[in-house]
A protein has these predicted regions:
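Flexible, acidic/Gly-rich N-terminal and inter-domain linker regions that tether
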Residues: 1-6, 16
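C-terminal scaffold of the Radical SAM
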Residues: 3-5, 26-50, 55-340
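Local cysteine-cluster metal-coordination motifs and their immediate loop/turn environment
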Residues: 13-24
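Basic amphipathic alpha-helical segments that dock to polyanions
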Residues: 334, 350-356
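Short amphipathic alpha-helical interaction segments
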Residues: 340-352
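A short, conserved structural fragment
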Residues: 354-364
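Minor-groove-contacting beta-hairpin "wing" of winged helix-turn-helix DNA-binding domains
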Residues: 365-369
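Short, amphipathic alpha-helical interaction segments positioned at domain boundaries
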Residues: 371-385
Length: 385
């Protein structure tokens, strides 16, 4: 029997400190808590022995939090459990997120020995004042030191995270960041525009009017748009094509894990706060780290939510995830998945969005226009049935 493709996502919810813009599930923790958490993760991985026989793992992604806070021994522990439990494709893409200043050459060698072949480094800005305002734990100079270590360790598939539309950021400071980053010749760049999320320090500042004036004034909509256009232009000049709303890569260096997610490949989340999609069912893990550790130790369920996806929900996901990609979605694929013509389900919406020049049709494919990409959140919301 042919094995089905599977993606693994491992959540490492530990940070030195939480950044001012971050609403991800993460917080600082003691060495003892981190060790206990890793032991619990290993137990969880081993619990999937029966399920694992049906799948071959194509991608593994360690996200957070800051996975690079793991010790070399903990990295080895986690990957030993994965390789003993799952069948992992020999060409699997294995990504680890990291922050500058949290690794040394020994840790990078441990990552490589464990099979990690792609690194995603959170830089966000090359301007030290902006980094300080973001609540980052590093300077640009410290990032450069980490980058040298990454090169020394021999990693050839490297993503750098950048942010635009930051408080106090100017078009000039953002262009300087792009220039400095492109000079390093990374294989991939994820470029995000700041979103003010409830529960973050930035949202609190915004509510209090601190981002309306002074040194940390938010850029205007026109400036934010200009930064977005600058990103596309400068990265294209550097040989990096845009393949998704916020992601750019050199040919062949697209993030396979994220592509799998947008293409609705089955995925298994491991760790507190992670989510899974297996056999048409979505389930979420308990978010509290201590409760997660205790429940794993006691053999209790760590699930807090289970949902068997209806056909309508699957159609929605097919459209709003697939349309994030520059290549868009395939009419034939929709027909094959659901036994229905996409026009019978979404005809009126497709016609309306094409008329508004937010969508375009080319042969079999439906995709966002350049303008549609700029207002993608509004466009994608149209596909909720």
């Amino acid at each position: 029997m042919k094995k089905r493709n599977l993606e693994l996502y491992l959540h490492i919810p530990f940070c030195v400190r939480k950044c001012n813009y971050c609403d991800f599930f993460s917080a600082s923790g003691t060495e003892e808590e981190q060790a206990a958490y890793v032991s619990a993760m290993v137990q969880e991985i081993q619990s999937y022995q029966e399920l694992s026989g049906e799948y071959e793992v194509q991608t593994i992604f360690l996200g957070g939090g800051t996975p690079s806070l793991l010790t070399p021994e903990q990295i080895e522990q986690i990957f030993n459990a994965i390789y003993h439990t799952f069948s992992v494709n020999e060409n699997a893409e294995i990504t680890m997120e990291m922050n500058p200043g949290t690794v040394d050459i020994e840790k990078l060698h441990a990552m490589k020995a464990a099979g990690v072949n792609r690194l995603s480094i959170g830089l966000q800005s090359a301007q030290n004042e902006e980094l300080k305002m973001l609540g980052r734990i590093h300077t640009f100079e410290e990032f450069l030191e980490t980058w040298k270590l990454i090169e020394q360790a021999g990693f050839k598939n490297r993503n750098i995270d950048l942010m635009s539309a930051l408080p106090g950021q100017t078009i000039e400071s953002y262009e300087d960041t792009l220039s400095k980053v492109l000079a390093l010749e990374p294989e991939h760049i994820s470029a995000y525009s700041l979103i003010l999320e409830e529960g973050t320090v930035f949202y609190d500042w915004y509510e209090k009017g601190k981002l309306d004036r002074g040194a940390w004034k938010l850029p205007s909509e026109e400036e934010e748009y200009a930064m977005g256009e600058l990103t596309i232009l400068r990265l294209a000049e550097a040989g990096m094509h845009r393949y998704e709303i916020s992601n750019y890569a050199k040919p062949g260096k697209e993030c396979r894990h994220n592509l799998g997610y947008w293409d609705r490949t089955e995925y298994l989340g491991i760790g507190a706060g992670s989510s899974s999609l297996i056999k048409g069912e979505r389930f979420d893990h308990i978010r509290d780290r201590k409760a997660y550790i205790e429940k794993i130790r006691n053999g209790e369920s760590i699930l807090i939510d289970r949902e068997i996806l209806s056909v309508e929900s699957q159609m929605e996901e097919f459209m709003y995830l697939g349309l994030r990609k520059v290549e868009g979605v395939s009419r034939i694929d929709f027909q094959n998945y659901f036994g229905k013509n996409v026009d019978d389900v979404y005809g009126k919406i497709l016609d309306k969005l094409e008329e508004e020049q937010l969508l375009e049709f080319s042969g079999d494919r439906i995709r966002l226009t350049h303008r549609g990409m700029d207002v993608s959140n509004c466009v994608l919301a149209e596909f909720l049935l």
